[in-house]
């Protein structure tokens, strides 16, 4: 079993974008920004424990930080990790919290 304190540090934020919204509607998939050292097993355990849903699969990718300019200097944004979490049929995570 994975430490509960570690599970709380794995998921950083939901990643809301046009692509994430399309994936959510078409494939019952939710996109999260996760810790860069998180494994697929940790991500699956964290989502199942925190949101009380059943996870079918997890796909991850590392997003490279963009180079940005501030005046004459160049800087670089941090690299981060993205996780596409596919939920089982009938499972749903509502980030907005609107009751209908």
Curated annotation (Swiss-Prot):
Pfam families: Ribosomal_L23. InterPro entries: Nucleotide-bd_a/b_plait_sf (IPR012677), Ribosomal_uL23-like (IPR013025), Ribosomal_uL23/eL15/eS24_sf (IPR012678), Ribosomal_uL23_CS (IPR001014). The keyword Ribonucleoprotein applies. One of its GO terms (molecular function) is rRNA binding. One of its GO terms (biological process) is translation. Keywords: Ribonucleoprotein, Ribosomal protein, RNA-binding, rRNA-binding. GO terms for cellular component: ribonucleoprotein complex; ribosome. SUPFAM superfamilies: Ribosomal proteins S24e, L23 and L15e. Part of the 50S ribosomal subunit. Contacts protein L29, and trigger factor when it is bound to the ribosome. One of the early assembly proteins it binds 23S rRNA. One of the proteins that surrounds the polypeptide exit tunnel on the outside of the ribosome. Forms the main docking site for trigger factor binding to the ribosome. Belongs to the universal ribosomal protein uL23 family. This is Large ribosomal subunit protein uL23. It comes from Colwellia psychrerythraea (strain 34H / ATCC BAA-681) (Vibrio psychroerythus). The lineage of its organism: Bacteria, Pseudomonadati, Pseudomonadota, Gammaproteobacteria, Alteromonadales.
């Amino acid at each position: 079993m994975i430490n509960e304190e570690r599970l709380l540090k794995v998921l950083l934020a939901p990643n809301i974008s046009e692509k994430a919204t399309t994936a959510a509607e078409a494939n019952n998939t939710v996109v999260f920004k996760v810790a860069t050292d998180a494994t697929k097993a940790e991500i699956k355990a964290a989502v199942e424990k925190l949101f009380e849903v059943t996870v079918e699969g997890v796909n991850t990718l590392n997003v490279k930080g963009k180079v940005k300019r501030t005046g004459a200097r160049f800087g670089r944004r941090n690299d981060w990790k993205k996780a596409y979490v596919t939920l089982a049929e009938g499972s749903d995570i509502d980030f907005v919290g609107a009751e209908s």
